[in-house]
Amino acid sequence: AYGAQGGYYNIMNNYYKLGPASAKDKTHARFFTAYIDDGKNAQDAGVFGYFYVNGNIMDNTCVDLSGEQQKEIASANANNISSTAFKVKNDERTSSDLLLDMRIDILSDYSFMQSATDAYETVLAYAGAWTCGWKDNEYIIPERDKIDRRIVSETANGTYSTNASKGGGYGLIDSQVDTIEKWDEYITATS
Protein backbone atom coordinates (compact mmCIF):
# COMPACT_ATOMS: atom_id res chain seq x y z
CA ALA A 1 0.00 0.00 0.00
CA TYR A 2 1.08 3.59 -0.38
CA GLY A 3 -0.02 7.18 0.17
CA ALA A 4 -1.38 8.61 3.46
CA GLN A 5 -0.27 12.21 3.09
CA GLY A 6 -1.56 13.35 6.46
CA GLY A 7 -3.45 11.56 9.24
CA TYR A 8 -2.74 8.86 11.80
CA TYR A 9 -2.66 5.17 10.88
CA ASN A 10 -2.47 1.82 12.64
CA ILE A 11 -1.12 -0.78 10.23
CA MET A 12 -1.46 -3.85 12.40
CA ASN A 13 -1.86 -7.62 12.11
CA ASN A 14 -2.35 -7.74 8.34
CA TYR A 15 -1.49 -10.87 6.40
CA TYR A 16 0.00 -10.20 2.98
CA LYS A 17 -0.23 -13.17 0.63
CA LEU A 18 2.19 -12.92 -2.27
CA GLY A 19 1.16 -14.31 -5.62
CA PRO A 20 3.33 -15.25 -8.60
CA ALA A 21 3.41 -11.64 -9.89
CA SER A 22 4.85 -10.42 -6.56
CA ALA A 23 8.11 -12.28 -7.05
CA LYS A 24 8.76 -10.12 -10.12
CA ASP A 25 8.10 -6.91 -8.18
CA LYS A 26 10.62 -4.99 -6.07
CA THR A 27 7.99 -4.45 -3.36
CA HIS A 28 7.72 -8.13 -2.41
CA ALA A 29 8.67 -7.40 1.23
CA ARG A 30 7.07 -3.95 1.63
CA PHE A 31 4.15 -3.34 3.97
CA PHE A 32 3.79 0.37 3.22
CA THR A 33 5.29 3.29 1.30
CA ALA A 34 4.50 6.65 2.92
CA TYR A 35 4.21 9.70 0.71
CA ILE A 36 4.92 13.28 1.73
CA ASP A 37 2.36 15.63 0.17
CA ASP A 38 3.74 17.56 -2.79
CA GLY A 39 1.16 20.35 -2.45
CA LYS A 40 -1.08 19.05 -5.24
CA ASN A 41 -3.71 17.80 -2.80
CA ALA A 42 -5.93 20.05 -0.69
CA GLN A 43 -3.14 20.76 1.81
CA ASP A 44 0.31 22.30 1.97
CA ALA A 45 3.38 20.60 0.58
CA GLY A 46 5.31 18.65 3.19
CA VAL A 47 2.32 17.23 5.10
CA PHE A 48 2.85 13.60 6.07
CA GLY A 49 1.09 10.89 8.06
CA TYR A 50 2.05 9.18 11.29
CA PHE A 51 2.13 5.41 11.51
CA TYR A 52 2.15 2.61 14.03
CA VAL A 53 3.23 -0.55 12.21
CA ASN A 54 3.33 -3.89 14.04
CA GLY A 55 2.24 -7.54 13.87
CA ASN A 56 2.06 -7.74 10.07
CA ILE A 57 3.13 -10.88 8.21
CA MET A 58 4.31 -11.21 4.63
CA ASP A 59 3.70 -14.77 3.46
CA ASN A 60 6.86 -16.33 2.01
CA THR A 61 5.43 -19.49 0.45
CA CYS A 62 5.38 -18.27 -3.18
CA VAL A 63 7.56 -20.75 -5.08
CA ASP A 64 8.85 -18.02 -7.43
CA LEU A 65 10.68 -16.12 -4.66
CA SER A 66 14.48 -16.19 -4.74
CA GLY A 67 16.61 -16.94 -1.69
CA GLU A 68 17.42 -13.23 -1.36
CA GLN A 69 13.73 -12.33 -1.49
CA GLN A 70 13.02 -14.93 1.21
CA LYS A 71 15.64 -13.23 3.44
CA GLU A 72 14.11 -9.78 2.82
CA ILE A 73 10.65 -11.10 3.73
CA ALA A 74 12.03 -12.68 6.92
CA SER A 75 13.58 -9.31 7.81
CA ALA A 76 10.28 -7.48 7.19
CA ASN A 77 8.39 -10.02 9.32
CA ALA A 78 10.91 -9.75 12.16
CA ASN A 79 10.84 -5.94 12.09
CA ASN A 80 7.79 -4.33 10.45
CA ILE A 81 9.52 -0.94 10.38
CA SER A 82 12.78 -2.07 8.79
CA SER A 83 13.91 -0.27 5.64
CA THR A 84 12.67 -3.26 3.65
CA ALA A 85 9.16 -3.16 5.13
CA PHE A 86 8.41 0.57 5.52
CA LYS A 87 9.58 3.20 3.03
CA VAL A 88 9.22 6.96 2.71
CA LYS A 89 8.76 8.08 -0.89
CA ASN A 90 11.01 11.16 -0.86
CA ASP A 91 14.01 12.46 1.04
CA GLU A 92 12.27 15.27 2.96
CA ARG A 93 11.66 13.06 6.00
CA THR A 94 13.07 9.85 7.40
CA SER A 95 10.93 6.91 8.41
CA SER A 96 11.68 7.66 12.08
CA ASP A 97 9.90 11.04 11.64
CA LEU A 98 6.70 9.23 10.65
CA LEU A 99 6.72 6.17 12.94
CA LEU A 100 5.02 6.06 16.34
CA ASP A 101 6.01 3.89 19.32
CA MET A 102 2.43 3.18 20.40
CA ARG A 103 -0.72 2.34 18.50
CA ILE A 104 -3.26 5.06 17.97
CA ASP A 105 -6.26 4.62 20.27
CA ILE A 106 -9.60 4.10 18.58
CA LEU A 107 -13.09 3.53 19.93
CA SER A 108 -13.26 0.24 21.81
CA ASP A 109 -16.17 -0.90 19.63
CA TYR A 110 -13.76 -1.07 16.71
CA SER A 111 -10.69 -2.54 18.37
CA PHE A 112 -11.26 -6.30 18.11
CA MET A 113 -8.03 -7.75 16.79
CA GLN A 114 -6.68 -11.10 15.75
CA SER A 115 -3.11 -11.99 14.96
CA ALA A 116 -2.27 -11.72 11.27
CA THR A 117 -2.18 -15.51 10.92
CA ASP A 118 -5.54 -15.96 12.68
CA ALA A 119 -7.11 -13.25 10.50
CA TYR A 120 -5.83 -14.97 7.35
CA GLU A 121 -7.27 -18.31 8.47
CA THR A 122 -10.60 -16.63 9.34
CA VAL A 123 -10.84 -15.10 5.88
CA LEU A 124 -10.08 -18.44 4.23
CA ALA A 125 -12.71 -20.12 6.39
CA TYR A 126 -15.56 -17.62 6.14
CA ALA A 127 -15.16 -15.04 3.33
CA GLY A 128 -17.19 -15.13 0.15
CA ALA A 129 -20.73 -15.64 -1.06
CA TRP A 130 -22.51 -18.58 0.52
CA THR A 131 -25.59 -20.34 -0.72
CA CYS A 132 -28.08 -21.42 1.89
CA GLY A 133 -31.79 -21.49 2.50
CA TRP A 134 -34.69 -23.68 1.49
CA LYS A 135 -35.49 -25.30 -1.84
CA ASP A 136 -38.40 -27.66 -2.40
CA ASN A 137 -38.99 -27.76 1.37
CA GLU A 138 -35.43 -28.94 2.02
CA TYR A 139 -32.78 -26.93 3.81
CA ILE A 140 -29.65 -26.34 1.73
CA ILE A 141 -26.44 -26.76 3.71
CA PRO A 142 -24.41 -23.53 3.40
CA GLU A 143 -21.48 -23.66 1.01
CA ARG A 144 -19.48 -21.14 -0.98
CA ASP A 145 -20.43 -20.54 -4.57
CA LYS A 146 -18.03 -21.98 -7.15
CA ILE A 147 -16.28 -18.69 -7.86
CA ASP A 148 -15.47 -18.04 -4.23
CA ARG A 149 -14.39 -21.69 -3.79
CA ARG A 150 -11.91 -21.12 -6.64
CA ILE A 151 -10.68 -17.81 -5.21
CA VAL A 152 -10.18 -19.23 -1.70
CA SER A 153 -8.40 -22.30 -3.10
CA GLU A 154 -6.09 -20.19 -5.26
CA THR A 155 -5.35 -17.89 -2.33
CA ALA A 156 -4.55 -20.77 0.01
CA ASN A 157 -2.41 -22.57 -2.57
CA GLY A 158 -0.72 -19.56 -4.20
CA THR A 159 -2.01 -20.50 -7.65
CA TYR A 160 -4.04 -18.74 -10.32
CA SER A 161 -6.29 -19.77 -13.19
CA THR A 162 -6.80 -16.50 -15.09
CA ASN A 163 -4.55 -14.17 -17.05
CA ALA A 164 -4.93 -10.78 -18.63
CA SER A 165 -6.53 -10.66 -22.05
CA LYS A 166 -4.06 -8.00 -23.19
CA GLY A 167 -0.84 -9.81 -22.48
CA GLY A 168 -0.35 -9.71 -18.72
CA GLY A 169 0.35 -12.83 -16.76
CA TYR A 170 0.88 -14.36 -13.34
CA GLY A 171 -2.81 -14.10 -12.51
CA LEU A 172 -3.11 -10.36 -13.07
CA ILE A 173 -6.15 -9.31 -15.10
CA ASP A 174 -6.94 -6.30 -17.33
CA SER A 175 -10.70 -6.41 -16.92
CA GLN A 176 -13.46 -8.25 -15.11
CA VAL A 177 -14.16 -9.85 -18.50
CA ASP A 178 -10.96 -11.87 -18.00
CA THR A 179 -12.61 -13.68 -15.08
CA ILE A 180 -16.14 -14.23 -16.33
CA GLU A 181 -17.55 -17.59 -15.39
CA LYS A 182 -21.12 -18.79 -15.24
CA TRP A 183 -22.41 -17.66 -11.87
CA ASP A 184 -24.36 -19.98 -9.64
CA GLU A 185 -28.11 -19.53 -9.64
CA TYR A 186 -29.19 -18.18 -6.30
CA ILE A 187 -32.50 -19.09 -4.75
CA THR A 188 -34.81 -16.16 -4.12
CA ALA A 189 -37.92 -15.99 -2.03
CA THR A 190 -40.14 -13.39 -0.50
CA SER A 191 -40.23 -12.99 3.23
Each predicted region: which residue ranges?
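An acidic, charge-biased composition feature
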Residues: A1-Y2
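Long, contiguous C-terminal flanking segments immediately downstream of a protein's structured core
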Residues: Y16-T190
